[in-house]
Every structure is written in C-alpha cells, then in structure tokens.
From Swiss-Prot:
Parts forming coiled coils: 576-604
Gene Ontology molecular function: any one: kinase binding
Pfam family, one: WDCP
InterPro entries per the UniProt record, alphabetical: Quino_amine_DH_bsu, WDCP
Domain of life assignment: Eukaryota
WD repeats: 55-97, 153-193
Keywords: Coiled coil, Repeat, WD repeat
The keyword ATP-binding appears for this protein: no
Protein name as it appears in the record: WD repeat and coiled-coil-containing protein
C-alpha cells in the first residue's frame, strides 16, 4: 500500500512499534500529520481500508498505541522533538462513524526525545519516556506531574529501553550496558535490580525488545571504534615468557579489556595497581627465545589480532535472561547489518526480525533453537530502507518501507530526518522443521582450500535472494560469511544447471589453464560444533578416481542434525558426515572433469585451421634485394612463400640480414612495417616481383636521388618500359643518349665558338 511522501527520522526509528490498534488500525505519520489507516484480517489476509487525518503538528517523530481492551477509549502517544502528547480516541456514542479526539497529557523534556523514546507498559497505562540523559516513568498519563526518574549510573548515553513481558522490569540500554530496574506498581517506585543492576553485553546497544517472561533480545552494532583505532598503537604480540619476565603486560599498559584469540574476555583485576607508562620501554636487552636463534637482540613479534574470534568483528543479537541466581545470555552475529536498530518479536513462533534504518536487508531469527538460526532473509531494493517492523500474525510481517532519493555518499547528512516515499509491505514468513545452525556462532568460517565446517551450515527457507547469501569464496582465505553462504554451496550442486560449473583454483583462472590431473580441492573437512572438532581423515575424503554420475542427488544440508547435545557429535553423526562428504567430493571430481572437457572443446573450437594450397602449386613471390651502388656488390634474389597472400616481415629481414626494410613502389620507396601477427600489412599475388633494400643505410639516399634524377632526365631517350632500372642499365642509357646529343649539337656549336 502506497502512503506517499513523508519526513522521517533517518536512524533509530521503528515506526510500526506499538503502532497497530485492533479497532483504529495503523497509526502513521508523514512528519507533520497523524493519520489512521484501518486494517482488518479477512480469513488471515490483511485488508487495508480508508485513511483519515486526526491531527496536525509542527513535528511528529513517532506514534504509539497504549494498552487496553478494544472497547475502551484508546490512548495514543504522539512523540515530538522535545515533548510528548498523549491523546484519547473514542467513537461518539450517538454516531459510530464520528471519532472524538482529546488531549489528556503533555510531557516536556529538556533534551530531545529518543527516536523510540515512548515505551508503553505491556498491561497498564504506564509510559516510559527516554531522552539521551534521562529515563522516567509516568505511572498515570492523566496526570502530568507524576513522573519517577530512573537513577542512571555512569556517563553513557541512553539509546533504547523496553519493559519485560510481565511488566515488572524496565531495562534501559545505556552505552554497552543494560540497566535493570524493578517497578513496584503498589508503591509506584522504580528501583535498581538487586541481583543484576548493570549487565555489560560487550557492544554498543542499538535496540532492545521483550521476548519471553524474563528474557529480552538485544541488538548491538559493529564496533567500528575498536576496529579502526582502539589498539592501533599496539600492533604486535610478544611471547608470554618475555612479556611476564621483562616488561609490563599489554593489559597493564592499556588499562582496558583485552580480547584473546579464543573469544574469551580477560577482565582486569580491580585490586591490582594500574601502572601508567609515560616513557618508552627499553626492550633491547631481551633476546629471542626462538630455538636456534642468533645472539642479536631481536624480538620475534607477530601481528596481534584483537577482532578475529573475539566476537568484535560484527554486530550481534543477544538474548539476556534475568534470573535471580544467574543472568544468562545467548549470542549470534548479524551479518551484513552494521547498526541493527529495528527489532520485532512474535511470541507464538518465537521469532525475532532484525533490520536497520540504513540497510536494505531484514533478517529473521528463530529463538526455539539454542543456536538462534537465521531462518529467512528479506531483500529490499537498493534505495529502499525499512523504517518499521511488526508482526501482524505469526506468519505475516508488516514492513514500512521508505524509498529514498539518491544522495551523494561523499556528504554526510546534516539533519536527523530525511524525506522518503513510504509504503506498507507484507511479507509472509515460511517456517519449516528443518535442521539449522547459525553460520556465525563463535565466528566460525569456511575456507575453500582449507577446511569446510559442515556443522555451521545454516538453513534458509527464504525465497528472497540476497547478495550476502552467495558468499565470497577465496582460496586460502576465509569465506565472507552470510546466513546462507554455506548451505548455498551444497544446495546449488543439486540443480542440474550447476553441474556445468565448479570452483577452480585462482591460479588456474589467471593462466586460463585447467590441468587434466585435478588435485583434491578439499584437503580436509572438519565438523566443528562450537570449538569441538571431530576431524575426518583426509584419505577417506580424497576425491575418487572413478567419476560418479552427475545426476546423483546430495542430501547433506537437509539431514544435518537440528541440535547438538552438549555441543558434541556422536560417532553415528560423524560417520554420517563422512559419507555425505565423500559424495560431495565425488561430485566435485565429476564437475571438474566436465569443466576440463568443456575447456578443451572451447580451445579446439577457437583454432581456425587455414586451408593451405597444394605443394605442387605454391604461392610465393620473388624478392630482389639491392645492395650498395658499386660494381663489387650484386643484387640478391630469393623466393619467399606467402601465407594467404601475406608476407612475414621477419623472414625478409632474416634472409637479407636487414634491420629496416623498404620496398620499391614505382619511383618511390616505402618502409615496411608489421602488424600484430608479424605480417606486412599488404597482400601480394603469387609470382609477383618485389624489390627491397636496406632502409637504414644512409648511402642510398644520396645515390638514389641522383639516380632518379638521371633516370627522369633521360626518360625520353629510354626505350625500355620497365618500371625498375638498376644503376648499370641507367648508366648505359645515359652514355648512349649523351653521345647522340653531342653528335647532333657539334655543327651548331662551332659557329658560336668562333663568334
């Protein structure tokens, strides 16, 4: 459904959060007006009705329906820049078609209200209001001065908040920590949680959403500050023995948390003194501990990787369960979305949809499995962004899509809002009882020439095609992960069209050669469920010498177990993986042979076999090479064969030992050149006479010019019709003509001499 033009916030907005009322329909805004659009479900299918404008303001950033029974007057919170107004809507008792709207509350704030700064209590008319600095609870919207502020510890900025499902706990996202408060409805108090007041999730919080009774879902953004420059000054790792014996540790130098390679976080002991290092540390006295090293004072350092395997290389979806004894978490990475600031939850299917105001990808995760698999992707157009998400039913996801005009990425936007063409889109979610595990749990990754982790192959049931789903496979490097990249690697082999292609080594592609003896492309295939690996021998995984049928169906992705007890593979599962991997290897071999055959056929087809003439009737020309203008030098004559009427210049140069060749054409000389194939760019006829000479000799230029002058002056005396005369014949003609001229002019010259 097209809604038209709207001016909405660029980031942090979920325009469909608490935006649907069972009676009044969808509340949405174009930035100034408050508009209601009727929505009904007819046999499970949503039907949109008429729209009506119920209010107009200078700025409208968000609309939120309050809780309550359908037959009671509805409460609508309208979020503006620095204040919030609460309106009551009800139908006229006499005329059901007439809607009565009245304001019951106006809440002003010293700071701008957050994009999702209005959070209604799930069961009661209690409203939580959020700014960047304050979080307060309005326990009665009919009274303006009944707010209770939350005691926010620390100096971080507030970004979002949510009530848990039972309504007893308010969780506020401040920086990278969750601040938990217990709401006492009887005494109207808001107190910090006693057993877990502050819980750090390890990443900057973008959005929170209540899921089950004591559980919330948290989305954290990609830590660009840590990637770009957190530990830029410390680029190397020092051996542990040297580090402990010779100089202060990395953590004591930096005074911050350190993330090790295995993903564990080393928290500094608060009781240990933090030694501030203000001068350079002398390391020249430390000798290398490498066996067989020389005595030179050199350190063997290696680049230190703070991100790979530490969970800091992507945004994350985290489930936090608040319990009295322990606060537990589950974590999965969100590939392709840098700032996941939109979330929606469906309690029936226990699925969470995650999106971003700045990315055209929507991911759907299932919370029923312990691995939090990504079950579907929704791909929007390149210039479209999701501006709101909510579940209509357990299978229908309502999306507010904003289409943005092209903006120059070189210039950062200067305002919090932007103009969009907005529309409502309904997407059906497909649920299958299918095995799946998360492709990005614990940062595991697959390699083409290394090992392929089959335990982390996700199962995607979406019909949407997303660029991330294809994956980028590079030899000797990790594959860029996506929720469906590994399953696609197996799925596409099933289709007959994919049998025409296979993965080739990059060096073969560069040289455009395919070897007949294919080495195994996969050296070892490991099943690694959460850092617990069950290795399969490389001998059983080697490619079979006998090619298998290309019609063979591979059933690897659909038979992967759905859950792993204690994250370990049983022997039966390991043998099952081994059999399927052998099938996969055999099909790879067959595909490689097919590619080899196709390559050879293409090479053979490109060869244009010329039709050569018979040896009894060869096609050749006679070439005469003129030497120096002296009686001792004689011209050299050779017959050279033609190639389809073309003459190869290098052959002429080699025969007559010439570096630069020029050919006689009438009374002129033409310097010969060669084309890209080495032929003279001229065609010759069989038995043609050609005269050439060395064009690099300077003696030719003077003598040839005099010779041409002599030939042209005696042209009337010559009786020969030949176009090319050598020097000897021209001199003979000159003598004859000169003697005749002297004989004819002698009588006339004598009288004149006498005079």
């Amino acid at each position: 459904m097209e809604l038209g033009k709207a001016k909405l916030l660029r980031t942090g907005l979920n325009a469909l959060h608490q935006a649907i009322h069972p009676v009044h329909g969808i509340a949405w805004t174009d930035g100034k007006q408050v508009i209601l659009t009727s929505l009904h479900l007819h046999n499970g299918e949503p039907k949109f009705g008429d729209s009506s404008v119920v209010g107009q303001f200078e700025h409208v950033h968000g609309l939120y329906w309050g809780p309550g029974p359908p037959d009671a007057p509805a409460l609508l919170a309208v979020q503006h820049k620095k204040h919030i107004t609460v309106w009551q809507l009800c139908f006229n008792a006499a005329d059901r078609n007439k809607l009565l709207v009245s304001q019951i509350c106006d809440i002003s704030e010293p700071f701008p209200v957050l994009p999702q700064g209005c959070v209604w209590h799930p069961k009661k008319e209690i409203l939580a209001v959020l700014t960047t600095r304050d979080a307060s609870v309005l326990h009665s919207v009919h009274l303006n001065n009944c707010r209770i502020k939350a005691d926010i510890k620390g100096s971080g900025l507030i970004h979002c908040a949510c009530w848990t499902k039972e309504g007893n706990r308010l969780v506020v996202g401040v920086g990278s920590a969750l601040h938990s408060y217990i709401w006492d409805d009887t005494q109207k108090t808001l107190n910090a949680c006693t057993f877990c007041p502050i819980f750090d999730v390890g990443g900057y919080i973008c959005a929170v959403e209540a899921t089950l009774n004591f559980q919330i879902a948290v989305a954290t953004e990609l830590p660009l500050d840590k990637i770009c420059g957190l530990n830029a000054g410390v680029a190397f790792e020092v051996p542990a023995s040297i580090e402990t014996e010779s100089f202060p540790s990395q953590s004591s130098l930096c005074g911050e948390e350190e993330y090790s390679m295995d993903g564990g976080k080393k928290v500094l002991d608060a009781e240990k003194p933090m030694s501030a290092v203000t001068s350079p540390v002398d390391l020249t006295h430390i000798l290398s501990s490498k066996p067989g090293a020389d005595s030179s004072p050199l350190l063997h350092l290696r680049p230190k990787d703070y991100l790979t395997g530490s969970g800091q290389d992507s945004s994350h979806l985290i489930l936090v369960t608040f319990e009295k004894k322990v606060t537990s978490t589950k974590k999965v990475s969100i590939p392709g979305i840098l700032v996941p600031d939109i979330m929606a939850f469906d309690i029936k299917t226990q699925t969470v949809s995650v999106a971003s105001n700045t990315c055209n990808v929507i991911l759907v995760y299932s919370l029923t499995s312990s691995n939090l698999p990504n079950i579907q992707q929704i791909q929007l157009e390149k210039n479209e962004k999701p501006k709101g998400l909510c579940f209509l039913t357990n299978k229908l996801l309502l999306i507010l899509v904003g289409k943005q005009k092209f903006t120059d990425p070189a210039f950062l936007p200067s305002s919090r809002s932007d103009k969009y063409m907005i529309r409502l889109m309904i997407k059906e979610l497909i649920f299958e009882v299918a095995p799946s595990t998360s492709a990005s749990v614990n940062g595991s990754c697959a390699s083409v020439n290394g090992s392929l982790n089959l335990s982390n192959i996700p199962h995607d049931v979406s019909t949407d095609v997303h660029p991330l789903s294809r994956g980028l496979l590079i030899p000797d490097r990790a594959a860029l992960q996506s929720p469906t990249s590994r399953r696609k690697l197996i799925e596409e082999i099933k289709s007959p069209g994919y049998e025409q292609s296979c993965l080739l080594n990059m060096s073969d592609l560069k040289e455009k050669k395919v070897s007949l003896n294919f080495p195994p492309a996969v050296e070892s295939l490991n099943a690694e469920p959460l850092n617990q690996s069950a290795s399969l021998s490389t001998t059983s995984l080697a490619f079979s010498n006998k090619p298998t049928s290309p019609k063979r169906q591979i059933e690897t992705a659909s038979k992967i177990p759905n859950s792993y007890k204690n994250n370990l593979l049983s022997e039966k599962e390991a043998s099952y993986f081994s059999k399927n991997v052998e099938k996969l290897s055999g099909n790879f071999t067959q595909l490689q042979h097919h590619v080899c055959e196709l390559t050879e056929l293409l090479k053979a087809g490109k060869r244009n076999l010329p039709m050569y003439p018979s040896s009894q009737e060869p096609s050749f020309i006679n070439i005469t090479c003129q030497k120096q203008l002296s009686r001792n030098d004689s011209d050299e004559r050779r017959s050279v064969i033609l190639c389809e009427g073309k003459l190869r210049l290098s052959v002429v140069q080699q025969i007559f030992n010439l570096s630069l060749v020029e050919m006689q054409h009438g009374s002129s000389w033409i310097v010969l050149t060669a084309d890209s194939e080495g032929f003279v760019p001229l065609t010759f006829t069989s038995m043609q006479e050609v005269v050439v000479r060395d064009a690099s000799m300077k003696g030719y230029s003077a003598r040839s010019s005099k010779t041409l002058d002599i030939i042209s002056s005696t042209e009337g005396c010559r009786h020969s019709a030949s176009e090319s005369l050598d020097i000897t014949s021209s001199l003979e003609v000159l003598r004859d003509c000169s003697s005749k001229a002297l004989d004819g002019s002698s009588p006339s010259e004598q009288p004149s001499s006498k005079v």
